[in-house]
Swiss-Prot record:
Source species of the chain: Maridesulfovibrio salexigens (strain ATCC 14822 / DSM 2638 / NCIMB 8403 / VKM B-1763) (Desulfovibrio salexigens)
Pfam family, one: Ribosomal_L29
Name of protein: Large ribosomal subunit protein uL29
Annotated Gene Ontology cellular component terms: cytosolic large ribosomal subunit
Disulfide bonds: none
PROSITE patterns the UniProt entry points to: RIBOSOMAL_L29
C-alpha cells in the first residue's frame, strides 16, 4: 500500500482501511504466538501500513 494511493482516499475509507489493518495485525499476532505464521515479514508490513494510514490521516487533519 503506497502513501500516494492513501492520500486519494477520503476519511471514511481511511478509517475502514485502518480497521482492516488492525484486525489483520491482531490475527497475525495470534498466529505468530501459536507458531502457525509462516511469513513473519507480514507482521512488519502490516505495522508499516498502519503507520502510513495514520500519517495520511494526520496530514489531512493539519490541512497539508
Amino acid at each position: 500500500m503506497k502513501a500516494k494511493e492513501l492520500r486519494e482516499l477520503d476519511n471514511a475509507a481511511l478509517n475502514e482501511k485502518l480497521a482492516e489493518a488492525r484486525q489483520e495485525l491482531f490475527n497475525l499476532r495470534f498466529q505468530h504466538a501459536t507458531a502457525q505464521l509462516e511469513n513473519t515479514q507480514r507482521l512488519s508490513d502490516v505495522k508499516k501500513d498502519i503507520a502510513k494510514i495514520l500519517t495520511v490521516q494526520r496530514e489531512k487533519e493539519l490541512g497539508a
